[in-house]
Curated annotation (Swiss-Prot):
It comes from Saccharomyces cerevisiae (strain ATCC 204508 / S288c) (Baker's yeast). SMART domains: Pumilio. This is Nucleolar protein 9. Its main location: nucleus. It is found in: Nucleus, Nucleolus. InterPro entries: ARM-like (IPR011989), ARM-type_fold (IPR016024), NOP9 (IPR040000), Pumilio_RNA-bd_rpt (IPR001313). RNA-binding nucleolar protein required for pre-rRNA processing. Component of the 90S pre-ribosome involved in production of 18S rRNA and assembly of small ribosomal subunit. Component of the pre-40S ribosome required for release from the nucleolus. Present with 2930 molecules/cell in log phase SD medium. Pumilio repeats lie at residues 92-127, 128-163, 188-223, 286-326, 334-368, 369-407, 511-548, 549-587. The lineage of its organism: Eukaryota, Fungi, Dikarya, Ascomycota, Saccharomycotina. Residues 642-653 have a biased composition (Basic and acidic residues).
Length: 666
């Protein structure tokens, strides 16, 4: 008898009871209910700190606006002049620091000043915020100033740690280390940690503090994948042209006290979320559900991801991981419902993708085995959610499990690429990592998608880069789009993956009208694809000649272009053993010497092509070419003597001509 489907009202009620559906306000309500865990004083004042410190008068505002413009222009003749100017700003700002950092206009000035000031001035600014760090971290503009301040402070902590006599450089007065000042600030923030975790601005500050305390890389504040700032903040920072100094994008050594503080912060948060439970068995299901709601909250989720990443430094039990997920070998209905939500929600899938990368392998294997193994293809088809989790599994599971995933997913790859091109990269990397597992099948699927044999109009530049719908050839000076960058990088990965894609790409380029290919050379993104196919040892000599026939006609204009000049640099090597083409390009550049040398890009091409040597000592230039050819093709055979038959014929003809000459003279 077949398995009957369970039905009935009781079963439906049980399903509804186990179903995970976060309430949009539940996390915030949870904060308000449990804020008293940290501080028994008025809760409203804590969650909404008083942040008005007055306003600058008109003259002060005008001075600081002008100072900000001057720093932005950065037209100082010497570093000393710039430092004196920064010092004068700091002197003028004394007593007004809080007004400055809470203003949209002048907060940018404070960031610039913090980036340029010396260590003593940095400490003075840091101390001016004592008592209001929490309030500033919750402020839209001041929170950015704090982030910049904390990164520079972390660099100073390391410097003091590694330089025992550092205090000799300090001015008169009591010496306070940056470490002690940092610890004092952390004590001020501890009563508000839970509020900060779910606060729009303070959550970024908290994440940065965790990175500093755990000695992780402090990322660049403008990079797209930076964990330091929100997407809007990174865009705004680029627009106002605030550049990070050398203290960013580094890992800093920290004192032991920082590790203790990290343990204290994470332990405090854990006790707050579990109501001080002594063991996991004392934690109620409702508490676990509420914390899971935090895990899928778009503000709190990145903080929890980071906590799970660093908690292993001192907590072997991985308490936060075990608060989110079970560790038993059996399925749990509530956990299953939660996993299903994670795999179908954008925030949830991003959370799961990140924690998989930092969790113990046995925990990841458990989740995969219980909840994902039997439906991996279905998850891969969820291009905005589950596909990211599958990619993370391919990176972190053991060889056996990765091969199982590849067995299931590779036959569907050409279809999956329709909506998720990055998935192709993950498959290629996983296949390579497993010694080229299913390599031929992967290549076949990729060719089926981008260069189908049965198609008469096949062109990988159209199918992969979507040239017809791109910004190529636009006269409006449109910036290349992020989608175009993503597609170009993927095609470059395919070119590196196998020679078939290199040859397919070259064939597609040669199939384009010449004008279209030249337009690609001047495009901010597609020029990289042209540059990438110019691989001397991988491209056969016939195709090299066909490409050079087109590119050499445009050599002067390419040399004077920001993107085309890189292609010209590659042609220096690409013309190896094709001396005729190399000389043709060199001659064209020399004929337009003035135009080339008047261009900053042209001068670099002139240098890389050794054209001064070409003009002054042609034979030395040709000798250099021969050396280059031998370096690129060390195993190439020298010119062979002609066969013996031809040699005899030549000798006979010589003897015959000599006999005729002798007869003539007689």
């Amino acid at each position: 008898m077949g398995k009957t489907k369970t039905r009935g009202r009781r079963h439906q009620d049980k399903q509804r009871k186990d179903e995970f559906e976060p309430s949009s306000n539940s996390a915030k309500e949870h904060i308000q209910q449990e804020e008293s865990t940290y501080n028994d004083e008025a809760e409203i004042k804590e969650t909404q700190p008083q942040m008005f410190f007055g306003v600058l008068d008109r003259e002060e505002l005008e001075y600081f606006k002008q100072a900000e413009s001057t720093l932005q222009l950065d037209a100082f003749e010497a570093p000393e002049e710039k430092f004196q100017f920064v010092t004068s700003i700091i002197e003028e700002a004394k007593g007004k620091e809080l007004k400055l950092v809470t203003s949209q206009i002048t907060s940018k000035l404070m960031e610039r000043v913090i980036l340029e000031c010396d260590e003593t001035q940095l400490k003075d600014i840091f101390q001016s915020f004592n008592g209001v760090f929490f309030g500033l971290s919750c402020h839209k503009y001041a929170s950015h100033v704090l982030e910049t301040l904390f990164v520079r402070s972390a660099a100073l902590v390391e410097r003091e740690l590694l330089t025992p006599s550092f205090d000799n450089n300090e001015k008169e007065g009591p010496y306070v280390t940056m470490e002690n000042m940092f610890l004092f600030m952390l004590n001020e923030l501890k009563p508000h940690l839970k509020t900060m975790m779910n606060h729009q601005y303070a959550s970024h500050v908290l994440r940065l503090l965790i990175l500093i305390l755990s000695s992780k890389t402090l990322p660049n504040s403008t990079k797209a994948n930076s964990t330091l700032r929100s997407k809007k903040s990174k865009i705004a920072r680029k627009m106002i042209d605030i550049k990070d100094n050398d203290d960013f994008n580094k890992v800093y050594q920290t004192p032991e006290s920082f590790k203790s503080e990290l343990r204290d912060i994470i332990t405090t948060l854990y006790k707050g979320f579990t109501n001080g439970a002594e063991s996991r068995s004392d934690i109620s299901q409702s508490t676990i559900t509420k914390f899971r709601e935090y895990s899928v909250d778009k503000v709190a989720s990145p903080v929890i991801q980071l906590i799970i990443q660093v908690e292993g430094i001192f907590d072997r039990d991985r308490s936060f991981w075990r608060l989110v997920f079970n560790t038993a070998d059996e399925k749990d209905p509530k956990e299953e419902s939660f996993l299903e939500y994670l795999l179908s929600d954008p925030v949830g899938s991003h959370f799961l993708e990140n924690v998989i990368g930092s969790a113990r392998l046995k925990y990841v294997e458990r989740l995969y085995r219980l909840y994902m193994k039997d439906r991996i293809v279905k998850l891969a088809k969820r291009d905005t959610t589950g596909a990211f989790v599958v990619r993370a599994l391919l990176e972190h599971l053991k060889e056996k499990d990765v091969k199982q995933i590849l067995d299931a997913v590779v036959p569907e790859l050409s279809m999956l690429l329709n909506s998720n091109m990055d998935f192709g990269t993950a498959i290629i990397n996983a296949s390579n990592k497993q010694g080229g597992y299913l390599r031929d099948d992967v290549i076949a699927q990729l060719i089926q998608k981008y260069y189908p044999e049965k198609s008469d109009a096949k062109n990988i530049l159209e199918s992969c880069l979507l040239l017809s719908a791109s910004t190529l050839g636009n006269t409006r000076d449109d910036w290349p789009t992020a989608e175009e960058r993503r597609r170009s990088v993927f095609l470059e990965q395919l070119i590196d993956y196998d020679d078939k894609f290199l040859n397919i790409t070259i064939d597609s380029m040669l199939a384009l009208p010449e004008e279209r290919l030249i337009q690609m050379c001047y495009h901010g993104v597609f020029s990289h694809v042209v540059e990438h196919v110019l691989q001397t040892t991988r491209v056969d000599i016939i195709k090299r000649k066909m490409l050079l026939n087109i590119l050499s006609k445009e050599s002067v204009n390419l040399a004077c272009n920001v993107y085309g000049s890189h292609i010209m640099d590659k042609l220096w090597e690409f013309t190896a053993k094709l001396t005729l083409y190399k000389e043709r390009i060199a001659r064209a550049l020399v004929l337009e010497t003035e135009k080339v040398k008047n261009s900053i890009y042209g001068r670099q091409v002139w240098k890389n092509w050794k054209l001064e040597l070409y003009v002054r000592k042609m034979w030395d230039w040709k000798k250099l070419i021969k050396e280059q050819e031998f370096e690129i093709f060390p195993n190439s055979k020298p010119l062979q003597p002609k066969p013996e038959k031809h040699s005899r014929e030549r000798n006979n003809s010589k003897e015959g001509s000599a006999f005729k000459k002798q007869k003539h003279y007689r």
